[in-house]
């Protein structure tokens, strides 16, 4: 059936197609702040956990106005190790996601973040003095793709699209940020623990990949006689 025929019949029935809604610009270029080199060069793989993180945030419409969700993802397993929601897209917002990632991987998980590569776009939040200073504190090396190139941060962009497709456009809009935060927490738990990932061996969920890695790389102490 021709598209024009479909549109005419939908109008007659008072129906409209599902759309992604109005686009909101979330990346503001950093002015005056040093810009790190691109250390990934579109290689979104990692040999083990805590070697490469990618970050980004996206907008989410609610009945109270636009809110924003930031993610930190480990490229080894595609696990979301940190996230945050906010009604403002400022540095404190993305720092919240970073702090959760540091707590998850280092403080709670006992991992070593020294030499980890943190990859972002040129958003002013990620290149701010407060944010980059926090990376330095943890021995994390900053990396950023070219200005305006979504391909240079494709893994993080893909995560945002999954979040929008699997949660935001399916179940939203929500009343306010509190409702969005609750829904996002549930989605992240499902994403990490249950959802199959085509980039992982056997399409395994992120936590399963990491459990398998940790099991295979646990050093067994020698038996004493």
Regions found by a protein language model. Name each.
Residues 1-48, 149, 205-218:
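Basic, flexible linker segments flanking DNA-binding modules
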Residues 2, 32, 36, 50-51, ...:
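Hydrophobic (often cysteine-bearing) scaffold residues that line and stabilize catalytic clefts
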Residues 6, 10, 40, 56, ...:
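Mobile genetic element proteins and their domesticated derivatives, centered on retroelements
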Residues 17-28, 117-122, 136-155, 170-175:
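RNase H-like polynucleotidyl transferase catalytic core
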Residues 42, 46-84:
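An active-site-proximal beta-strand-loop segment
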Residues 65, 84-109, 127:
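Active-site beta-loop-alpha junctions of metal-dependent nucleic acid enzymes
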Residues 110-127, 146-150, 201-207:
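Acidic/histidine-rich, metal-coordinating catalytic segments
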Residues 129, 133-140, 161-225:
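C-terminal domain-tail junction helix/linker
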